[in-house]
Structure formats: structure tokens, C-alpha cells
């Protein structure tokens, strides 16, 4: 099932997601729905908070990028970055921040401890694009969006688009969750 994507300023995107204690049929269904939703958008990574579930769960598939065609889709549960190395800047975008792109500096290599869809533990090293996508998605689990990591001058350039998203004035080729703008209350 295709799930609607929550967009910029939705509270679920700024909350710290809760760890999973295991994988049952409802989590397996959510994982399948997340892959379907990611491919429909199309995207290369999707975190559970982006589809309204405050859980430490994400899916990644960078094989649609020509130079990464050999990579397999990946399910990551309860990730924890245990070490980082190098740094580089690269343009990022996000399904939850449609129409916005900007450079973000991140470590170019990470060692990640996580559980897979069978809840089996792994510790692996990732570099380049895969390291970047994983860090971007893990940020979602920690309540951080890529625009929060952009240089201030770059963020100012996209502020009008961010304001439009915040007000629910955004069009996408994929379904987005209903957006209820905050209403000012007079004291």
C-alpha cells in the first residue's frame, strides 16, 4: 500500500523515534508499504517518521542510481552510528521537503550497528552514497531534516519554499499526508 508522506513542519518529523523491540506482522507490513511508497515517489530512502510512524526503522535502495546498480534494498532497524571518517559536501533532497535541495556536509564513511528485517544484528561499514543516504534517514529518526544541516545562507535561499510547504501549499507526484497549519492563538 502506498502511504502518504509527511512534510516539513509536521511534528512527527521533529520527534525522536522510538526503538523497535522486535519484528511482527504489522512491522513487516509497514516495511513493505514503506518500500512501495519510496519506489512510487520515487526516492532512494524512507524513514518510518516520514510516513507517520515514530519508529527507528528505515528502508534504503540506491540501486536505481546507475553506478550503484549492484546494491540490494536494505531494511535498517534501531541504527546506531559507531564511528565516522572523512567529510564531504553533496546536494541532498527529501520526499518530506519537496522542491528543496541543498548542500549538506556529512562524514563520507560510517560504521553502523543495526538490526535487519529479521531483527538480526549487524555492524557494517558504509561509504560514499550509501553512507550519506543512511545518515540522512537516521537524521529523520532523530527529528532532524537535511535543511537543518544546511548552511544558513543556503537555507535562506529556500525559506519561501519551506514556508509554502509549512502552509500546505505544495504539489507532488506522490501522496502527502494532510497538512494542518498551526493556528496562532491570541492571549
From Swiss-Prot:
GO terms for molecular function: metal ion binding; peptide deformylase activity. SUPFAM superfamilies: Peptide deformylase. It holds the Pfam family Pep_deformylase. Binds 1 Fe(2+) ion. Its cofactor is Fe(2+). It comes from the Bacteria. InterPro entries: Peptide_deformylase (IPR023635), Peptide_deformylase_sf (IPR036821). It is an enzyme of class 3 (hydrolase). It catalyses: N-terminal N-formyl-L-methionyl-[peptide] + H2O = N-terminal L-methionyl-[peptide] + formate. Coiled coil: none annotated. Its EC number is 3.5.1.88. One of its GO terms (biological process) is co-translational protein modification. Fe cation binds at residues 94, 136, 140. Keywords: Hydrolase, Iron, Metal-binding, Protein biosynthesis. The active site is at residue 137. Removes the formyl group from the N-terminal Met of newly synthesized proteins. Requires at least a dipeptide for an efficient rate of reaction. N-terminal L-methionine is a prerequisite for activity but the enzyme has broad specificity at other positions. Belongs to the polypeptide deformylase family. This is Peptide deformylase. It comes from Chlorobaculum parvum (strain DSM 263 / NCIMB 8327). The lineage of its organism: Bacteria, Pseudomonadati, Chlorobiota, Chlorobiia, Chlorobiales. The gene is def.
Amino acid at each position: 500500500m502506498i502511504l502518504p508522506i509527511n512534510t516539513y513542519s509536521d511534528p512527527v518529523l521533529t520527534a525522536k523515534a522510538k526503538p523497535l523491540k522486535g519484528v511482527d506482522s504489522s512491522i513487516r507490513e509497514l516495511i513493505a508499504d514503506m518500500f512501495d511508497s519510496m519506489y512510487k515517489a520515487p526516492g532512494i530512502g524512507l524513514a518510518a517518521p516520514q510516513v507517520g510512524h515514530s519508529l527507528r526503522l528505515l528502508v534504503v535502495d540506491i540501486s536505481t542510481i546507475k553506478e550503484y546498480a549492484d546494491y540490494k534494498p536494505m531494511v535498517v532497524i534501531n541504527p546506531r552510528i559507531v564511528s565516522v571518517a572523512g567529510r564531504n559536501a553533496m546536494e541532498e533532497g527529501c520526499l518530506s521537503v519537496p522542491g528543496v535541495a541543498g548542500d549538506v556536509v556529512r562524514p563520507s564513511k560510517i560504521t553502523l550497528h543495526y538490526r535487519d528485517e529479521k531483527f538480526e544484528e549487524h555492524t557494517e561499514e558504509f561509504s560514499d552514497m550509501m553512507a550519506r543516504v543512511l545518515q540522512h534517514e537516521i537524521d529523520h529518526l532523530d527529528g532532524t531534516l537535511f535543511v537543518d544541516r544546511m548552511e544558513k545562507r543556503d537555507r535562506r535561499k529556500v525559506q519561501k519554499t519551506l514556508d509554502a510547504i509549512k502552509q500546505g501549499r505544495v504539489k507532488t507526484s506522490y501522496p502527502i499526508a494532510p497538512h494542518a497549519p498551526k493556528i496562532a492563538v491570541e492571549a
